[in-house]
Amino acid sequence: MIQQESRLKVADNTGAKEILCIRVLGGSSRRYAGIGDVIVATVKEAIPGANVKRGDVVKAVVVRTVKERRRADGSYIKFDENAAVIIKNDNDPRGTRIFGPVGRELREKRFMKIVSLAPEVL
């Protein structure tokens, strides 16, 4: 459950380490984002020489949340951290690698490139 001012770890190799959510996309009064939802964020921490810099405003898709999510079969999925992958405007990832597992909800929301790059889909 990600909302404005939430800080997320970046799970790709764009060079950003941490981002801060500034808007949840998908409706004028949408408050929370879960796995597979797109957010607008600003880069708070980045490594030197990266293709994204501190202060850049980026779009990202949430891939892991600490808040559990109930699935259609009755099971729950939750992770140890909140993480996101920085994406381009056409919903393709800006990086070339994804670190850590991602939720199965990304496949249902048509983020196929992220699912194929991820080492594990839970």
UniProtKB/Swiss-Prot annotation:
UniProt key word RNA-binding: yes
UniProt-recorded Gene Ontology molecular function terms: large ribosomal subunit rRNA binding; structural constituent of ribosome
GO CC entries: cytosolic large ribosomal subunit
Keywords carried by this UniProt record: Ribonucleoprotein, Ribosomal protein, RNA-binding, rRNA-binding
Domain of life: Bacteria
CDD domains noted in UniProt: Ribosomal_uL14 (cd00337)
Record has rRNA-binding as a keyword: yes
InterPro entries listed in its UniProt record: Ribosomal_uL14 (IPR000218), Ribosomal_uL14_bac-type (IPR005745), Ribosomal_uL14_CS (IPR019972), Ribosomal_uL14_sf (IPR036853)
Alphabetized Pfam families for the sequence: Ribosomal_L14 (PF00238)
PROSITE patterns reported in the protein's UniProt record: RIBOSOMAL_L14 (PS00049)
GO biological process, one term: translation
Sequence similarity: Belongs to the universal ribosomal protein uL14 family.
PANTHER family on file: 50S/60S RIBOSOMAL PROTEIN L14/L23, LARGE RIBOSOMAL SUBUNIT PROTEIN UL14M
NCBIfam families reported for this sequence: rplN_bact (TIGR01067)
Assembly and binders: Part of the 50S ribosomal subunit. Forms a cluster with proteins L3 and L19. In the 70S ribosome, L14 and L19 interact and together make contacts with the 16S rRNA in bridges B5 and B8.
Functional summary from the UniProt entry: Binds to 23S rRNA. Forms part of two intersubunit bridges in the 70S ribosome.
Name of this chain's protein: Large ribosomal subunit protein uL14
Source species of the chain: Mycobacterium sp. (strain KMS)
Gene name, Swiss-Prot/TrEMBL: rplN
